[in-house]
Amino acid sequence: TIEEVLNLPPYVVAA
């Protein structure tokens, strides 16, 4: 979810 993405580092967001 968006909330989870906001807590993840950029390389995880891109994955």
UniProtKB/Swiss-Prot annotation:
Main location: secreted
Subcellular location: Secreted, Cell wall
Top-level taxon: Eukaryota
Record-level GO cellular component terms: extracellular region
Keywords per UniProt: Cell wall, Secreted
Protein name listed in UniProt: 15 kDa cell wall protein
Organism, scientific name: Nicotiana tabacum
